[in-house]
Amino acid sequence: MIADFEVFGRDVVSVADVATALGVATDSRRLKNAIHELVKLGWLSPLSTRGAYEFLPARGGPHPRGDPLVEARAVRARRPDFSLAVIGSGASFLRGFSERAPSRYAVAVDKRQGGSVALMVAYDVVKTTAKRISDIPDLHDVPVSDAAHLLADAALWPRISGDLRDADHWLRRVLQTMDPAAAAAIALRAGTAATARMAYIAARFDSPIVAAAIAEMLTDRARTCIGAAGDPIVARDQALGVDDRLGIATR
């Protein structure tokens, strides 16, 4: 059974998977004993998702690998129609734009669907609309924000995108690789206020072409801010209608 899981590259296995490998019923005593023994020996590690385990293959030894996507994969395996995406700093690290992983990853979910205790245990969960996390490409079987979506993440949820005041923030590297047309297409789904913030952030990180492409999507002048509403205004873009209370790229 262990060899089969390794051959097929399984990193998340369910109770049903183990039962199938053993050729027993899911409610059998033999199955329960086998899972208990596999956990004891370090081959399986229980996940927060009910009935799911992380498989720890022999090539790495029976020790946890620290895969940040394993809980998200387990939730999707159990609920294939569940809409989620890894966003912000965690996505930036996984996509290779930042060198440091966050202490805790953030996951956006469609607010219209039921919640997930497993996700809330493993991640910072942001509830949003389905269209804001649609079409995010998969990375290792989990949707993870790519370059254009990372800019939208920063505009929508600045707190999960690191310190945007840093002039050498990873967004600068993201913007250098970004397709302006792709960013503009995503801005159409983000809403007027977020679109204005996307354009402003791109401009602050010296990407005028991306900023202009996004700004063209605006049909009305926005009235929005970046940062806490009670904080003083650091900068203001009258054309976009953005008050910067955070100080994007000022340090």
PLM features: what roles do these ranges have?
Residues 18, 91, 151:
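A residue-level signal for conserved active-site and pocket-lining positions in enzyme catalytic cores
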Residues 1-81, 176-196:
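Short beta-edge/loop segments at beta->alpha junctions of small alpha/beta modules
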Residues 132-251:
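Hydrophobic alpha-helical interaction segments
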Residues 49-51, 104-106, 164-167, 186:
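Short coil/turn segments at secondary-structure boundaries
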Residues 45, 54, 108, 124-126, ...:
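Residues in well-ordered beta-strands of folded domains
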